[in-house]
Every structure is written in C-alpha cells, then in structure tokens.
Curated annotation (Swiss-Prot):
Catalysed conversion reaction: RNA(n) + a ribonucleoside 5'-triphosphate = RNA(n+1) + diphosphate
NCBIfam families: rpoZ
Keyword Nucleotidyltransferase: yes
Family: Belongs to the RNA polymerase subunit omega family.
Top EC group: transferase
SMART domains, alphabetized: RNA_pol_Rpb6
Name of encoding gene: rpoZ
Stated name of the protein: DNA-directed RNA polymerase subunit omega
Assembly: The RNAP catalytic core consists of 2 alpha, 1 beta, 1 beta' and 1 omega subunit. When a sigma factor is associated with the core the holoenzyme is formed, which can initiate transcription.
Function: Promotes RNA polymerase assembly. Latches the N- and C-terminal regions of the beta' subunit thereby facilitating its interaction with the beta and alpha subunits.
GO BP annotations, alphabetical order: DNA-templated transcription initiation
This protein's UniProt keywords: DNA-directed RNA polymerase, Nucleotidyltransferase, Transcription, Transferase
GO cellular component term, pick one: cytosolic DNA-directed RNA polymerase complex
Length: 130
C-alpha cells in the first residue's frame, strides 16, 4: 500500500526527499492529535500522511510552512527600521552646524620614507628542511 501511495505523492511533491520530510512531519502531527483528513483504514500514521498528500486533502505547501515553523528556534520579529541616515559625501547632503572639522596631518613622501627607514626589519627565521 505504501509503495502505491508514494508513487501517487510524487505527482504532488517533486522531490522524494522533500516528500519524506513532509510525510514524517504530518505523521508526527497526527501522533500529537491533529485531525485526520482521510479515513484511517487501519493504516499507521506515515501511510495516512502519505494518503493525505496523495489525495491533496492537505497542501504540501502548507505542510512545508508548518515544518519550517516547527524547526525554527527563534521567531523573527519585524521591527521598524530606524530613520535613514544620509550617507557621508553623498550629493546634496546637508552639513549640520555642530559638525567639527578634524585636523589631519599631511605627510610628504620624503617624511614617509624616513619614517620607514627607522623601522627595524623583521627577523628572518631559518627554514627547517624535512
């Protein structure tokens, strides 16, 4: 009975692995007391869940949403975004009066080279041969 049911379900759910996940989730829902949408006919919960999917008495998309929701550890809450802040240097950006200019010391190329000469080179470590 289950083999025929699986072949019927492949038309509704393209991927066999997705079908297994959805049917298992629905079987767990039935075990926890969810209402059946087809007659049990002395079948076990996995077979009943496959029959429900094959008969389209339950939507695979709804099952997928319920499965994802059951696996989520944290519920995402959409919070309002803070007011947008204009980008620095964007065209048309207004300059506030309380902005202070930061003094940046400029360095010539010669001063940079003199500073680099004063730095000690890194010590070379001898390579070990294996």
């Amino acid at each position: 009975m289950a083999r025929v049911t699986v072949e019927d379900c492949i038309d509704k759910v393209d991927n066999r692995f997705d079908l297994v996940l959805l049917a298992a989730h629905r079987a767990r829902m039935i075990s926890s007391g969810s209402q059946l949408t087809v007659d049990r006919d002395n079948d076990k919960n996995p077979v009943v869940s496959l029959r429900e999917i094959a008969d389209t008495t339950i939507s695979p998309e709804d099952l997928r949403e319920e499965l994802v929701h059951s696996l989520q550890k944290f519920v995402e809450v959409d919070e309002p975004e803070p007011d947008t802040v204009p980008l620095i240097g964007s065209a048309g950006a207004s300059v506030d009066a309380d902005d202070t200019e930061v003094a940046v010391e400029r360095m010539t190329e010669e001063e940079l080279l003199k500073g680099l000469e004063g730095l000690a080179p890194p010590e070379e470590q001898p390579e070990e041969d294996e």
